[in-house]
Amino acid sequence: MSLLQIYWRALQYLAAYRLKVSLVVAANIILAVITIAEPILFGWIIDAISSGKPDKDILFLWGGFGIFNTIAFVLVAREADRLAHGRRASLLTEAFGRIISMPLSWHHQRGTSNALHTLLRASETLFGLWLEFMRTHLATAVALVLLVPTAFSMDVRLTLVLIVLGLIYVAIGKMVMDKTKDGQASVESHYHTVFSHVSDTISNVSVVHSYNRIQAETSALKTFTSKLLDAQYPVLDWWAIASGLNRIASTASMLIILIIGTMLVQSGELRVGDVIAFIGFANLLIARLDQMRQFSTQIFEARAKLEDFYVLEDSVQDRDEPVGNRDLKSVRGDVEFRHVSFDFANTTQGVKDVSFTVKAGQTIAIVGPTGAGKTTLINLLQRVHEPQQGQILIDGADISTITRQSLRNSIATVFQDAGILNRSIADNIRIGRENATDEDIVKAAEAAAATDFIESRLSGFDTDVGERGNRLSGGERQRIAIARAILKDAPILVLDEATSALDVETEERVKSAIDRLRQNRTTFIIAHRLSTVREADQVLFLDHGRIVEMGGYDELSAKGGRFAALLHTSGLLNDDDKTAVKVG
């Protein structure tokens, strides 16, 4: 994208505030016009003083312009600040909502820390552009456009000096941007690397401590920051050179104006006040050119950040619900997969031509080796991914025609990784049903056998669980997740090895709660511990994304196939009678 395209798209984010932004910009343009009048008035004052006939009216007018300009600038700047801050806050909220709505495959491919870093840096960059647009960008352009003809009307020769000064500024800026284009892109790449390393290390700090990686990870970060500085320094050097060249040009221009102006005053072609006015014009021009240079630097440095953000924004635009999708209501729980296929990009993993039917209220266990596609099936059911072929139906309705919100309201999931947020225990359980009362939360916790450890905490249900629930044990986190699913009370239940983190005694208590929860609900059990699938009405054995075996527990146990072999390996199939031993 060109710099102009990047800038124009940045301004399009202000569309919702169009009226207020237009008023602020218009006010700044008026202020820019007033600043051009000030040097002229000051020149008149000097002429009046030189002639020995000071004009009080002009003096008061000049002072009034200055006071008005100052007060108006403060008010306009205040409004511009509020608009820019407000738009940044709304942008963060909007982009955050779109990002978290994306499928897991998008997050795995993009990287959560990368998306977060891109969003945060872009929001700060856009904030700076919006603020300067409202404060200076258009005002600077208008001031420069008006300054030249005004100066021409006073003296062509001195005006040419100002024009040459402007051309020098433009040439220097163009040269530096050409020299630093690749370097600035490299700087942004290194920033992403640094942020990703910090985020990755801190999120896995327990591993870092366990394997004594503190020094190694710190050294790695030092290496990354050194590479960042190696890329940053040449860019900074070029802009420092540009600043020096601009200062030389502005000083030389002022000197030339004074020399030529003195000669013209001596020859009687100009008054002293005219020269003073031109010096004011020169100072004004230099200030505006400096603003242009800062704008050029700003948009140039923003280029890599915003290009990455625009790619991010474009990639999340397609998650809007298709027009015409309807809500899923009065769900019985009949589920059917019809020749469903889905492949992950650049891998051999996924599911291939999967077909099965689950009647309302039945329990189906999905087993198989790691990477067989068990979790993928459940993600397809919840429209985390969309099938590339085939259909998934609930109560006879293709879920691709159902709104995601109503679909997911009908499914309660207990993940193997409990998914605990950095909030209170009550807040984590309330995720199951936002409008749940405190009494509802307590009942759900009791059903999940969680009240014992909750009540042992000083703050009880108000206990802050820490980041990812790190102040709780694995079993405690899992029981909160089960309580959340109980509270949701959805007609379809998904258990992703829900008791895997529990000890034997707690597992028995939770199993009773889960058995009650499964009643009159369609239940999917993703099983790694095969002792949990005994009571399933139907068992699917997946391997490499395909259904290898399907049938009842006892049927598959006696069949002597892949499922029976897995039971035998797990110690759940007796060699003498080849029957499953009920565990628990």
Swiss-Prot record:
Span of domain ABC transporter: 335-569
KW Transmembrane helix (keyword) present: yes
GO cellular component assignments: plasma membrane
PROSITE patterns according to UniProt: ABC_TM1F, ABC_TRANSPORTER_1, ABC_TRANSPORTER_2, NDVA
Binding site for ATP: G368, P369, T370, G371, A372, G373, K374, T375
SS bond partners: none
CDD domains named among the record's database cross-references: ABC_6TM_NdvA_beta-glucan_exporter_like, ABCC_Glucan_exporter_like
Molecular function via GO: ABC-type beta-glucan transporter activity; ABC-type oligopeptide transporter activity; ATP binding; ATP hydrolysis activity
Family membership noted in the UniProt record: Belongs to the ABC transporter superfamily. Beta-(1-->2)glucan exporter (TC 3.A.1.108.1) family.
Protein name: Beta-(1-->2)glucan export ATP-binding/permease protein NdvA
The gene coding this protein: ndvA
